[in-house]
Design a protein with these regions (language model features):
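Catalytic-loop of the protein kinase fold
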Residues: 48-50, 55
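Hydrophobic residue at the +6 position relative to the catalytic HRD Asp in the kinase catalytic loop
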Residues: 58-60
């Protein structure tokens, strides 16, 4: 029950942040805020999570497929390790963009030619390294992480609007909120079909 409450608390937190900074109505965000509390999987146990675990926060060994260091730990907290893993896996399914969240996207690239594993293999490698026989369905976690990222970007846009922050990329961030919400809703619908 504690794990379920934490998932609901996270959705409630990001929903409140989003609503406080909203500059327009985005139906997919409203759908996600209604759908997520009842559809996030029960947490797979608490552990230290990075909070911003993505490829550009990793230093990789130049001569072998090995992580040498993980950078930027300021968002670290206790949480669901699968949610942290799936945030990392978003690079494989994130719509490509020249600015902001999509700049690190691997979508449409030949990841194996880049020396990276396919998403399915990467997730399986994680499960094996973590001593897990399998992973829960990833689609609800993808829906949550796209929702969370959209809420974070909208929060920045809202602070710029309110004059409490400045960001030269605020327009580009604002332009990404809707596509991220659409991607989140896409994954929620995929979860319903699974």
């Amino acid at each position: 029950e504690m794990c379920i409450r934490d998932s609901q608390r996270q959705v409630r937190r990001w929903s409140e942040n989003y609503r406080l900074s909203a500059t327009e109505t985005i139906d997919d965000m409203d759908r996600l805020m209604a759908w997520l509390p009842d559809h996030l999987p029960t947490s797979q146990g608490a552990s230290i999570v990075h909070g911003d675990y993505r490829l550009d926060n990793l230093i990789l060994a130049p001569d072998q497929p090995q992580i040498r260091a993980v950078l930027d730990w300021e968002l670290a907290t206790l949480g669901d390790p699968i949610a942290d893993l799936v945030y990392h896996l978003m690079a494989w399914v994130m719509p490509r963009s020249d600015t902001g969240a999509g700049t690190g996207s691997l979508m449409g690239l030949d990841v194996e030619a880049l020396g990276l594993p396919r998403l399915e293999d990467h997730a399986a490698d994680y499960a094996q390294a973590a001593g897990r026989s399998n992973l829960p369905p990833l689609e609800p976690y993808l829906a949550y992480n796209f929702f969370r990222l959209a809420a974070i970007l909208q929060g920045i846009v809202g602070r710029v609007r309110d004059g409490t922050a400045s960001n030269d990329n605020a327009k580009a961030m604002a332009d990404q909120v809707r596509p991220l919400a659409q991607a989140g809703w896409h994954w929620a619908q995929q979860a319903e079909r699974s």
